[in-house]
Structure formats: C-alpha cells, structure tokens
Amino acid sequence: MEGYRLDPWASAIRLEYEKLFRYFGIKPFQPLLPEVEKAFGKPHRLMRRGIIFGHRDYEKILEAYRSGERIALVTGFMPSGKFHFGHKMVADQIIYYQKLGFEIFVVIADAEAYAVRRLDRRKIIEIGLYEYVANLIALGLEKNKHTHIYFQTNYETPYYRLIQMFSRRVTLEEMSAIYGDLEPSKIMAALTQAADILHPQLDYFGGFKYVVVPVGADQDPHIRLTRDIAARFENELGLRRPASTYHRFQTGLDGNKMSSSRPEYTIFLTDPVDIAVRKLKRALTGGRATVEEQRRLGGEPEKCTVYEFYLYHLIEDDTQLRKIYEDCRGSRLLCGPDKEYAAELLAKFLEEHQRRLERARDRVLEYVEPPKF
C-alpha cells in the first residue's frame, strides 16, 4: 500500500481499480449479482454494467433484506458546485433503494464545504437547496416519512454528540496513515462523515443496524475510518460496521474525472440544452485517427466518453446498448452519427428534467430545513 493513497477531497483523480481490491480489501461486486437479483429483482443498470464494481459487506445487506430487516441507506453531497451527471449517478442509486423500501438518509455536507472548500456559507446553503435537493426531487426522490435530508449544521443533538465521542477514540497518527497530510478542517470533516454514516443506528434515529453507503471509490478512506470507529463503539453504543458499495467515476468529456471545477469538460443538469449538446459533440471518443482507419479497425467504445453516457445514463435497455457497442467495434457506427444520436437522447432528457426541476425548486423546503445562519 506504500505510495498508493486515496484522497477523498481531490477534485480530479485517476484510480487503478484493481489496486483497490489488492491493497484495501474491497471485494468485487459482480459475483453478488445473482444474489442481488434474488433479493431485489432485476439489478440496477449500474450494477449490471459493472459501474458499481466493489463492495464491503454487501452480502449482509442482501441477507438482511431477504430476512425482512430494516435497512438504511446513507449518502450525501458536498454543495460546492453545480449538479452534474456524476452526481446523478449517486441520485439514481438513492432513488433505486427508496423504491426497495430502504430508509433514506441524505446529508448535505455544508460544514465540510465551508471548512474544506472554504466557500461562502450563504452560497453553500443556496447550492445545497436549489442544485442538490432540487435535482434529487426532479429525478424522482419522493417525500415520505422514510426519507430524511439534512444539512450537517442543522441537525439533531445526538448526531453532534457522536462527533465529540468519536474524537476520543481516534488518534492523529491513525488518521494521518489513512489520509496523509491533515489540517483541522479535514479532521473535523472526517469525524463528521463518520457521524453521518453511523447515526441511523442510534435508537433516536430509528435504530437501523444495517446501513449501506454507496460512494465513489475515492471516498473509501472515510468508509475505512468509519468502520474502525464503529467497532470501537460496539459495546458502548451498539454500533456495527456499515456496508458500502463503490462506483466508477463519471469521466469528464476530456477523459479525466468529471468535476464541477472543470465546467468545460462537465455536463451539468442545469446546462442549457444547446450548450450541453455542444459540449457532448466536442467530447473525446474512441474513434481512430481517420475515418478510413476506423472503418478498417473499428472504434474503441471502452475509451469513448460518449459511449459512457449511454452506459451510465442515456440507455436503459441492455440489448440496445450492446448493439451500439458492437456497431462501433464493427465499424458500422462512426463517431459523427454516434454523437448525433447521443445528443438527441441527451437533449430529450435535459428538456424533460429541466421542466421538472423548475417545479422542484418550489418544493425544496418540503424536504429539508436549511440552517438559520
């Protein structure tokens, strides 16, 4: 593991996913697909297509679900920029689990955005409400008694007590081994995230002893720390290690990680449709240097950011997706027509989504109470 460390606060990162299995003990998700189908029915497309690629203790979640146990999902968003398709991948998972009957806890990490990203507090709250909560609503998150959205700085007293208690049983040396160089803001953020993940297990919040956390692979340092903390508080508070799943990054249009800090290579769900389409048509593809070469050798959809939009978001039907893949590999689909088709699907999605988003922005306060200052 020497020389290979994950940074959960980096805005751009390249991961070698195989190393996550080898160095950090993450298990492959694909062998669980038959059990997922037995428990939940047809697996989510992100599961079927290998985008959700790894897990910790997910078999315990499947067993608990089959046994009729109550299960909580916990995940969150740092409101530091506009909501893009990488965020949508997390939202899609939240909505999937809501439909399965999981208790849903979504944290808007405003304390972390303020301390680590050093953004203006009022702007953070505005982004949290009208970018993140509003887009969740527009994508289909329902309001019910089993769904809880909260800001880190405006929650219940037992949650804050957890943060204080956790600080007693974690050493600076231990945190440095996980995260590397640290500053007070990151220590606070890590302990707060542990409370975000573990608080549903307290009786005050429902006593959910089975918790699953879907995250990007770069967030595994938080998961490892949280699992260690849970074990240390098993006797005192009855905490259990949370399960987790890991998904691949949404690639930016230049082939690097999609990020709000790189808007020219990122498609936001609030982009005007013509701008989003223009961005997509400039995207890196898996095409060859010339049309003649592509007709001879075929394309490489594995390297194509446009194909990735099909894979992650734009095409639900696996048979249709397979045809596009094979047509690209077999030189029957060239990059120009492919981008035109992807642009049509993207435009249709954004037009419909943005109509829902306008209505959703009027409803955000039904879902969450913002901080008072």
Swiss-Prot record:
Enzyme's top EC category: ligase
Pfam family, one: tRNA-synt_1b
GO molecular function, one term: ATP binding
Entry keyword set: Aminoacyl-tRNA synthetase, ATP-binding, Cytoplasm, Ligase, Nucleotide-binding, Protein biosynthesis
Record's signal peptide: none
Entry superkingdom: Archaea
Biological processes per GO annotation: tryptophanyl-tRNA aminoacylation
Swiss-Prot/TrEMBL catalytic activity: tRNA(Trp) + L-tryptophan + ATP = L-tryptophyl-tRNA(Trp) + AMP + diphosphate + H(+)
Predominant localisation class: cytoplasm
An example Gene Ontology CC term for this record: cytoplasm
Annotated EC: 6.1.1.2
InterPro entries: aa-tRNA-synth_Ic, Rossmann-like_a/b/a_fold, Trp-tRNA-ligase, Tryptophan-tRNA-ligase_arc
HAMAP family: Trp_tRNA_synth_A (MF_00140_A)
Record-stated family: Belongs to the class-I aminoacyl-tRNA synthetase family.
Name of this chain's protein: Tryptophan--tRNA ligase
Provenance organism: Hyperthermus butylicus (strain DSM 5456 / JCM 9403 / PLM1-5)
Lineage start: Archaea, Thermoproteota, Thermoprotei, Desulfurococcales, Pyrodictiaceae
